Amino acid sequence: MTQRKVRVRFAPSPTGALHIGGVRTALYNYLFAKQNGGDMILRIEDTDSQRFVPGAEDYIIEALTWLGIKFDEGVSFGGNYGPYRQSERREIYKKYVDQLLNDGHAYIAFDTPAELEEKRKEIANFQYDASTRSQMRNSLTLSQEEVQSLIESGHQYVVRAKIEPNEDIHVNDLIRGEVVINSSILDDKVLYKSADQLPTYHLANIVDDHLMEVTHVIRGEEWLPSAPLHVLLYRFFGWEDTMPSFAHLSLLLKPEGNGKLSKRDGDRLGFPVFPLEWHDPKTGDVSSGYRESGYFPEAVVNFLALLGWNPGNDQEVMSMDDLIRLFDLSRCSKSGAKFDYEKGRWFNHHYLLEKSNAEIADLFLPIVESHGIQTTHAYVEKVVGMMKGRVNFVSELWDLCSFFFIAPTEYDEKTRKKRWKEDSAVQLGEFIEQLRAREPFDVEGTENECKAWIESKGYHLGNIMNAARLALVGEGKGPGIFDITEALGKEESIRRIQRAIEILK
């Protein structure tokens, strides 16, 4: 048998913002496909019309595009296996629903929600299965004429899978090994609803995966309990020889490790759980996103890749190309991965440092201008070079280095009490003259000359430098004094020191 080309799919439902766990699933599918020279498909599973949220589909595509997760075919990308939106495949599914009914692997059920609720009250832990289906209104208990009459009179119905009890179903999982589940614990899942003439996830994804020639299904472990049903459906259709390999990914857990990561955890601890900012059209709520929070896409990708997978060594920093080369499903964890959001910040800091000063200046200049400052790209680039090692995000730069653009009008009281001495005003007055006389006004030459002067006068170097920093910055933090003076220029440096002398003397 010839080996089939690897084809994977990411198949989200457009029911809201894409959770970061879903992003990781998409990433792992992409890495696996690219490593094996395969295709990545985007399929939109919009069979649940009641949960459809306008804008969600566009959000999903924009988010994955931002992260560099590229599709070879699918919704918005075209391809030979379309349509790729499940709501556009009604006629395709109906054919396979009829096949299951004709072959005796499914049946029609007319039970109303009220009748089902009554059964749940009557029978503890009720589920619709081989032990209870004989008590219900369905094509197994009604005559063919009664069934036909109900359908023709417009009664809504569902089609349920007919699961026979007492059979061990084997699911071969690429991460977890062989999983065996007895069919007796399975219920007769709904496969199709006449109300909207659409299948449920269980039928639609099996039919689509088969027709789209998907070879590997890589998805979250929440679908593992459904895998036995999916294996049975492949058998019912006679598609066992082309059934894809399964890999069920472990959950992303709360930072504390107790339970699945949720949006509420992000709100509570101050980190996003969505790739992009999300404006909920139903509630008007706005949820933060990694992009808008200042994360670089390569940092998010690197961070997510290591949540539940490792390369087998101590390597942490990996580009997308590195990940494609190293990714191995067998090294995915079976247990959940704690969401370490501080590690995400560390990755962003790393990638920020890797970018050139010019690239960071491109991002920081609009922030500077938003404060009413008119300056040059070259000046911002110089400031960035001094300060980027101190931040995790570009957005943090302003609070650390606004003094490069706005002269201090106040002086930190704690620093003033500690660093401004009785003789600081006199010594800084003399220091000004050293700065005024210095040409060229560079970093190294000015520093060497001023330190030599301080030594010749017998002054304490720390006293003058600390007082000068307070005058130039307004507090006791910042880069080297002579880096600051060179950036500000001679006139501005002198003006700031003179003003501090007048106020603090």
Curated annotation (Swiss-Prot):
Segment forming the signal sequence: none
Reactions this protein catalyses: tRNA(Glu) + L-glutamate + ATP = L-glutamyl-tRNA(Glu) + AMP + diphosphate
Disulfides per UniProt: none
Major localization class: cytoplasm
Keyword Lipid metabolism: no
EC number: 6.1.1.17
GO biological process, one term: glutamyl-tRNA aminoacylation
Any one GO molecular-function label of the UniProt entry: zinc ion binding
Motif mapping: 'KMSKS' region: 260-264
Record-linked Pfam families: Anticodon_2, tRNA-synt_1c
A cellular component term, taken from the record's GO annotations: cytosol
Known role: Catalyzes the attachment of glutamate to tRNA(Glu) in a two-step reaction: glutamate is first activated by ATP to form Glu-AMP and then transferred to the acceptor end of tRNA(Glu).
Annotated protein name in UniProt: Glutamate--tRNA ligase
Organism the protein comes from: Parabacteroides distasonis (strain ATCC 8503 / DSM 20701 / CIP 104284 / JCM 5825 / NCTC 11152)
